[in-house]
Design a protein with these regions (language model features):
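Short, glycine-biased loop/turn motifs at secondary-structure junctions and
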Residues: 1-93
């Protein structure tokens, strides 16, 4: 399943450093507790990550792909044990 993930600057999420075009694995996936979270709809990610942080710096966003069967309890936020981080998305203007 393909989707989108938000990050703090530097592709950091919950103190974990991510990298483009890299696969990450965790031993367990449980919504809001364990695993790596993402949204299928890119606009849903904005419910969890603002475009601009309170300090004026932008958050980062990337395309992702779950390489296992993702879990969800609301069909909006998904959780995976094995997630491929694709390319970062940018806003050009």
């Amino acid at each position: 399943m393909k989707g989108y993930k938000g990050f703090n600057p530097g592709l950091i999420c919950k103190d974990k450093q991510y990298q483009e075009n890299t696969v990450f694995e965790e031993p367990e996936a449980k919504i809001c507790e364990k695993g790596m979270h993402f949204c299928e709809n890119p606009f849903d990610v904005l419910d969890y990550y603002d475009l601009i942080r309170s300090d004026g710096t932008p958050n980062e966003f990337a395309e992702v792909e779950a390489l296992d069967e993702p879990k969800t309890d609301d069909k909006k936020k998904f959780c995976s044990r094995k997630l491929k981080i694709g390319v970062k998305l940018g806003l050009s203007g």
